[in-house]
Every structure is written in C-alpha cells, then in structure tokens.
Amino acid sequence: MEKQTVAVLGPGSWGTALSQVLNDNGHEVRIWGNLPEQINEINTHHTNKHYFKDVVLDENIIAYTDLAETLKDVDAILFVVPTKVTRLVAQQVAQTLDHKVIIMHASKGLEPDSHKRLSTILEEEIPEHLRSDIVVVSGPSHAEETIVRDLTLITAASKDLQTAQYVQKLFSNHYFRLYTNTDVIGVETAGALKNIIAVGAGALHGLGFGDNAKAAIIARGLAEITRLGVALGASPLTYSGLSGVGDLIVTGTSIHSRNWRAGDALGRGESLADIEANMGMVIEGISTTRAAYELAQELGVYMPITQAIYQVIYHGTNIKDAIYDIMNNEFKAENEWS
C-alpha cells in the first residue's frame, strides 16, 4: 500500500498503540488531543507515560491540539475517543473537514442516552460527501501488548467490503493482522457489550470465585450478547469470531482490562466512585451497562447477567445476592444463543 496520512483522534492507550502500528507500516500519523501537556510530551519526549511508562514512540509520530491542522489533506481518520464524546468530536470534524476521507473508529461502547452504536453516530454527524462507509476496528487487543509489538489479530468491519479491505491493508503487518467483516452491527455490539461481562468476570475474581464460575460467565455472557445483537440485526456467527468470543475472552480474563479491574475492585468491596477516581481511564463497561440494560428492556431481550450488573452498579444491590439470584433463575435449555 502507498503511504497514507492518517489522523488518530484520541491519544489514549489504544489510540497511541494504533498510531505506532500505522507508523510501523510507513504511514504519516497525526495524533490529535485536547491536553496541551500530553501533546507536548509526545512531540518533545516521544512518550505517553500516563499509559505506557517504558515505551518510546517513533519521532515521526506527531501530535496536535489544532484539529484543522490535524485533518489537512489526510486520507483517513481514526476515532479513538471515549463513547460519551464521540458525537461532539464528530461534529467538530464535520465542521473542519474539507474533503472526502475514510472514516474509522476503534472505540467500544454505546452512546449513553440514545443507546446508539458509534458508527450510527458518525453517520449522523459527518455528511456523506465527506466520508466513506464507516469502518469499525475491533477485536481482542490489549494496548499494552500491541504497543510492544506482541501478536494481535482483530477485525475491520464495514458495510462496504472494499472499504474494509482498505483498512485491512492499512494496518496489517508481521505482528498486527486484520480480517474483514461486513456485519457492522455484530462487530460493534460485541465490542461494546463484552465490557459489561468483563466487569462481572472481574467481580467474580474479587469475590474469590474459581475458574468454573469465570468460564460460566464468559459462556453465558456470550449467549446474552448474541441475543441482543441478533435482535438488533446482527449475524449470530459474528459472535464466534475475533470481535465476539475472542474479545470477550481477552477482556474478561486479563488484568490488562480496565473493565475487569473495575469489576475486581467492586468484588473486593470498593465503591464505584473510588474505582473511577483511581483508574485514571474511562471504564466503558459502566456506562454501557445502563445503555444495554435499557435497550434489552425496550426490545424484550433476556440478559440476566447485564441486569444483575446494572442492579449492582446503579441500585446498590449486594453483589453476592445478584449472583445467587441468577443461580436461582428458572431452569432453561441451552442452545445456540439460549
């Protein structure tokens, strides 16, 4: 692939890691953020120590606070900002951009109040004459591993296969590999909803439960993620892939996962306010829990794990009581996404 110019909106852990992948592939990378001290650190010291204490970035990765300068003559834009500000940043991009580009996003969540997927938000806010079909970049990927060039395999999903293939070529190299998919709904819902299950899996660990329980929450969590996704129009097969069960495993079993760590702290009795203050990063699973719970209620989809986590986070239900309420639910058969 010829050298491309890519704007990465969001200098967090994942935005930084993906910037390095793109730079390794010979592309011009411009990171945009709104914290001058962080942008200055990236440009002066080539570090982003809030997220990666021991990583030195290539000096060709340049960071900006000026959005117009960031977007000038770019070929593609990658959104990697928190879910709650995606719409605002998209509006700013729409007001600034003056040519058509490939639009990608690598964030995982649902908009808190509207329950909308992020590709829907980008489609609503960025006019068609300025963008391609949206491409979702998602899958089992800890930034802490990608930044040190550990093997990572994820998915590029778009309604337009050729656009997904462009993104596949843009990112893929000897340590980072993308597969294409056209099921945008499935890939996005899998990426968003697995954060909820990761909170639950972490809570089980914090409470001292063993591997049996942790395996069960991943398997049954995948079942209810699939139920909601299918109700929204996704293919059930997507949830057996990298962006589905793959992402759920990596997020629901690892200390690298901020959602897992948040659940672990909840299980050990810490308050949600203290957890959010100590984490120093956005915990998407918290806001996504409310959005998914309300969406499931609206669509009549059975999601007992999500409901239990919602009750714990937003209504102060005792975690162990919530767990044993699930254990005492009506007996059911198990099938494809029962």
From Swiss-Prot:
The reaction(s) this protein catalyses: sn-glycerol 3-phosphate + NAD(+) = dihydroxyacetone phosphate + NADH + H(+); sn-glycerol 3-phosphate + NADP(+) = dihydroxyacetone phosphate + NADPH + H(+)
GO MF: glycerol-3-phosphate dehydrogenase [NAD(P)+] activity; NAD binding
Listed EC numbers: 1.1.1.94
Pathway: Membrane lipid metabolism; glycerophospholipid metabolism
Active site residues according to the UniProt entry: 194 (proton acceptor)
Described purpose of this protein according to its UniProt entry: Catalyzes the reduction of the glycolytic intermediate dihydroxyacetone phosphate (DHAP) to sn-glycerol 3-phosphate (G3P), the key precursor for phospholipid synthesis.
Family the entry assigns: Belongs to the NAD-dependent glycerol-3-phosphate dehydrogenase family.
Protein name, UniProt field: Glycerol-3-phosphate dehydrogenase [NAD(P)+]
Source species of the chain: Streptococcus pneumoniae serotype 4 (strain ATCC BAA-334 / TIGR4)
